[in-house]
């Protein structure tokens, strides 16, 4: 509740970082395919049906799905160990959210984090290596459609999936830039017989988000 108030994020679900696959499997229904995706090098957030309704009412209000993910950097494993030492008990699940105010771009510079996140975070952990580009976590959803086999749908292509190219059925004579819409924005560059999708940018309703949108286009082109 405190985190939602500080981030101005009243209703959107949070993701859960699970210590390992066994912990994630205790929380949500995971098929073999979903487990493979969770453990792949893309390490996405997987939206899956919760095994116990209302287990985390503050995390996923209004939905019966939970977004679970596994650690994708060594520091996240160390954070689990550090939390365990502080609380003197095993910590298997952490609530995850991005470093930003709702509807603003992700913060990836140390100086910006100090300026804008100091009133939200109790502590800031950073590295002396500069982060060049911010990128959201990718989100996949596990769905069972009637009697068919389970399908994994990409809800947000970002970390781990971009800037990989996608094939086109034919080549284009002239390269083109597709800039998308104002909401849930993503841009794409079309060249030859390939399309290069940017990572998820988000809504462009905030001035900072629009400037970030322009920076992504410049990087892509």
Predicted regions and their residues:
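Active-site-adjacent structural elements in enzyme catalytic cores
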Residues: 1-221
